[in-house]
């Protein structure tokens, strides 16, 4: 795997510095305890119908059962994203933009056998994920870098596929898709799963604004994704509305001891129609 890029821990802006600081300090049990279930640490939400029996029965085991069920739904979400990456072969190279602690990157390598580059602003996340790669014996194929996803330094047309899993709300979409378009080989695939506010609703609702403040992010309008893709040679080939599929996850998480307090805000945002959870896949032309 090429190691020639320069890793720079200096954020490109004050805002990026605040994001790096946030994730360097983050040690939320809803991320860590779920990852300890099977060693795949995710930083995204889940989809699918839960097994509601986990919140019933023996209170002594309910916490563990609920944790496992939340993790199952988050892993299912990652699998659904990977299903849309297209024809990735072992000789290809792909990138996880906003990789967190690396869960989806390891899943991608196991599925495709290819090289995976993970990118995060957080030194803590990168160090954690690289330690995981060494423990798994795949450090020669899966590597994590403290880099700005808007300016990675990777070679032009070096990637077969790139994905953002709930990380686009931290960047300008035109800048992001310009860099992704540069990195993707012609015919390569880009996939994102993201929350976005519904243009039909108007401006961001109070619930969406609360989510922005909670995560120090800037949720984009749905239309913004398609405008920025069109401007950067990314042609959508699939759009899947996952809003209804993610609401049960949030209802289960709200009942969990791992709830962080933001759950009811997400439920309100989704059920009011002001917020949507989408998968968008696009081809580089």
Swiss-Prot record:
GO MF term set: C-methyltransferase activity; magnesium ion binding; S-adenosyl-L-methionine binding; S-adenosylmethionine-dependent methyltransferase activity
Any Pfam family the entry gives: Methyltransf_25
EC number of the protein: 2.1.1.255
Keywords: Magnesium, Methyltransferase, S-adenosyl-L-methionine, Transferase
Reaction(s) the record says it catalyses: (2E)-geranyl diphosphate + S-adenosyl-L-methionine = (E)-2-methylgeranyl diphosphate + S-adenosyl-L-homocysteine + H(+)
Entry keyword Lipid metabolism: no
Required cofactor(s): Mg(2+)
BP GO terms, sorted: methylation; terpene metabolic process
Coiled-coil features, chain-numbered ranges: none
InterPro entries: Erg6_SMT_methyltransf, GPPMT_Stmyces, Methyltransf_25, SAM-dependent_MTases_sf
Superkingdom: Bacteria
UniProt record similarity statement: Belongs to the geranyl diphosphate 2-C-methyltransferase family.
Cited function: Catalyzes the SAM-dependent methylation of geranyl diphosphate (GPP) to yield (E)-2-methylgeranyl diphosphate (2-MeGPP).
Protein name: Geranyl diphosphate 2-C-methyltransferase
Organism of origin: Saccharopolyspora erythraea (strain ATCC 11635 / DSM 40517 / JCM 4748 / NBRC 13426 / NCIMB 8594 / NRRL 2338)
Taxonomic lineage: Bacteria, Bacillati, Actinomycetota, Actinomycetes, Pseudonocardiales
């Amino acid at each position: 795997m090429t190691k020639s890029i320069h890793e720079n821990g200096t954020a490109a802006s004050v805002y990026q510095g605040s994001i790096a600081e946030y994730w360097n300090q983050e040690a939320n049990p809803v991320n860590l305890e779920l990852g300890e279930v099977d060693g795949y640490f995710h930083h995204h939400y889940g989809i699918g119908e839960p097994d509601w029996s986990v919140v019933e029965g023996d209170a002594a085991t309910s916490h563990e059962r609920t944790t496992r069920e939340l993790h199952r739904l988050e892993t299912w979400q990652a699998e659904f994203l990977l299903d849309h990456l297209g024809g990735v072969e072992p000789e290809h190279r792909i990138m996880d933009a906003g990789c967190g602690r690396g869960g989806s990157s390891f899943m991608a390598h196991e599925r495709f056998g290819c090289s995976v580059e993970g990118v995060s602003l957080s030194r803590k996340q990168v160090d954690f994920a690289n330690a995981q790669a060494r423990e798994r014996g795949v450090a020669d194929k899966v590597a994590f870098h403290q880099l700005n996803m808007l300016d990675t330094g990777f070679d032009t047309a070096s990637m077969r596929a790139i994905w953002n899993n709930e990380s686009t709300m931290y960047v300008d979409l035109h800048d992001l898709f310009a860099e992704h378009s540069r990195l993707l080989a012609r015919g390569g695939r880009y996939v994102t799963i993201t929350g976005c506010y519904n243009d039909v609703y108007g401006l961001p609702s109070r619930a969406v604004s609360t989510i922005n403040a909670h995560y120090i992010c800037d949720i984009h309008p749905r239309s913004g994704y398609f405008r920025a893709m069109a401007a950067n040679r990314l042609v959508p080939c699939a759009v899947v509305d996952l809003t209804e599929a993610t609401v049960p996850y949030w209802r289960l998480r709200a009942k969990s001891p791992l709830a962080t307090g933001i759950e009811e805000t997400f439920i309100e945002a989704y059920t009011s129609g002001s917020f949507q959870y989408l998968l968008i896949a696009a081809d580089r032309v």
